[in-house]
Amino acid sequence: MDLLPVEIKVNVEGDVAAALSALGASGRATTVRHIWFAEDRDGAAEGQVLLLESGVILRFRIGGDPDDLTVKLRPCLREQLVGRFSAPFEAKPFTYKIEQDWSANGRVLAASLVHGHAPGVLSGAVAPGGDPATAVDALEDQFLHACTPSVQLDGLIALGPVRSTKIDDVPLDDMDVDLEAWSAAGLDFLEASIRVKPKDEDDAEKLAERAERKQRKLSEAVQARGVVLSERPENKTQRILTALAEATA
């Protein structure tokens, strides 16, 4: 079985602007987008995030070029990913990725199908009264039915917007780190992430050892600049979606 890239994430607590400055992001090019997540309407009315709890994320990103809709399974099992979804592929306007997702609180597998769209095409699906499911096309629907057939996209509501500010490839020691700040529902988060790609000489053990070293280096580099890492068990998607659902209830 092919080795998979590892995305390593650390979350930051406290003053996001101060953390960005301490990590060297000031003056660098930024990408600002607005993000919506689709959730079960009835569940959100009770402050619940049923789609997320079933391991499915539907994320709309608007304001980039292109805009995009991502259908992600996280966590998932490799055995779930069947047929054409058993291996990564790119077929414009689609990109399909399978990655290991590591954080301080665990390691999971994630599979995501990203569909790029022209600016403005997705706006109606996330507008008040809109139906996010109308933006899910045949390939994304096939992905869900093949890999998580118990999940139904009926009665959805768009939760958001979340303001996302992303700064890519910030040099931190000998690493190029992506920084992304999220702001919504009275919450502000910052995530720092790197990717570790398999090398030709890697086996599973070598890749894991290299990723573990990188994970330690990332945490140490962030903390060495006076930035406090989060000790909360939830990732940023869980925290922000829960807050948005509670605000809807």
Residue ranges of predicted features:
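Phosphate-end processing signature that detects enzymes handling 5′-triphosphorylated RNA
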Residues: 1-249
